[in-house]
């Protein structure tokens, strides 16, 4: 943690940083972990997280807020600005949360009618809100899928919990796949690269799963849930029902994203060197 760009007095001790008589300050928080890929033990073969964090913190020494913000906006907009959508919606005069409340109807009665027996009115569409949702989905993917080998998970980057629901894992019986539905269709092919690397890690572990669970000596499989370590075996919490726990088509569904990349790019080298070996 570094505190700088302040008009107050800063002191530091074992308890932390203290700012006195200041009206403003810029605080840089730098974090790192020992995660070093799914095949490496984070303790015995982990990344040098202290050195990495210290190096990142050192690079903030001669950087002010405006420079950091400018670099962020430039990096983000090179992807975001590729696609524009105009459905003819007008800029609203209310905040987004107020706009949402005005557009989302209350749950209707079971018969779909009002108290006087009349059909419930159909809510009108809002072209601005639909455009906003479209670009919001692209924003989420750009922000969540930039780390090599680590695709966007169930909660993205914004979970407020130390232990997130479903551990912020990868649910591969639709959630992980739908995270990446906007990638090629909205010109964000780079965001799929972490998913490609993750599928390759799944394929390595999936060879053991398909052999030990199903007695098959070729190919690979992945079940419904995975994590940072690219696990592929059947898992679950509490009641591990076979209805979902033993579903083993996660790998088959995920490799469809590899084929989609080829359909969009027609990159035969990618098809030959990466996609087909994982699909066969």
Positions of predicted regions on the chain:
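Helix-terminus loop motifs that line ligand-binding clefts
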Residues: 145-174, 181-256, 262, 269-274, ...
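Acidic/polar, glycine-enriched structural segments that form the non-catalytic walls/loops
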Residues: 1-170, 188-211
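Extracellular structured ligand-interaction cores
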Residues: 22-26, 136, 176-177, 244, ...
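Residue-level recognition of tetratricopeptide repeat
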Residues: 138, 260-263
């Amino acid at each position: 943690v570094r505190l700088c760009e302040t008009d107050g007095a800063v002191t530091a001790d074992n308890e932390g940083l203290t700012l006195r008589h200041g009206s403003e300050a810029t605080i840089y928080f730098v974090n790192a972990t020992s995660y070093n890929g799914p095949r490496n033990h984070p303790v015995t073969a982990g990344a040098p997280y202290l050195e990495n964090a210290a190096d990142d913190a050192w690079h903030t020494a001669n950087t002010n807020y405006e420079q950091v913000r400018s670099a962020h906006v430039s990096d983000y907009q090179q992807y975001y600005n590729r696609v524009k959508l105009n459905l003819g919606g007008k800029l609203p005069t209310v905040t987004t949360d107020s706009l949402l409340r005005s557009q989302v109807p209350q749950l209707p009665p079971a018969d779909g009618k009002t108290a006087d027996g009349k059909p419930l009115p159909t809510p009108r569409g809002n072209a601005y809100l639909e455009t906003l949702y479209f670009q919001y989905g692209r924003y989420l993917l750009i922000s969540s899928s930039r780390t090599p080998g680590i695709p966007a998970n169930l909660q993205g980057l914004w979970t407020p919990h130390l232990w997130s629901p479903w551990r912020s894992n990868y649910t591969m019986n639709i959630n992980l796949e739908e995270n990446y539905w906007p990638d090629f269709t909205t010109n964000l092919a780079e965001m799929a690269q972490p998913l490609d690397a993750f599928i390759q890690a799944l394929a390595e572990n999936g060879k053991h799963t398909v052999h030990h669970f199903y007695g098959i000596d070729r190919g690979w499989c992945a079940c419904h849930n995975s994590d940072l370590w690219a696990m592929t075996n059947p898992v679950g919490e509490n009641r591990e029902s076979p209805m979902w726990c033993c579903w083993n088509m996660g790998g088959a569904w995920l490799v469809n994203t590899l084929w989609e990349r080829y359909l969009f790019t027609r990159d035969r080298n990618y098809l030959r060197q990466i996609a087909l070996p994982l699909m066969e």
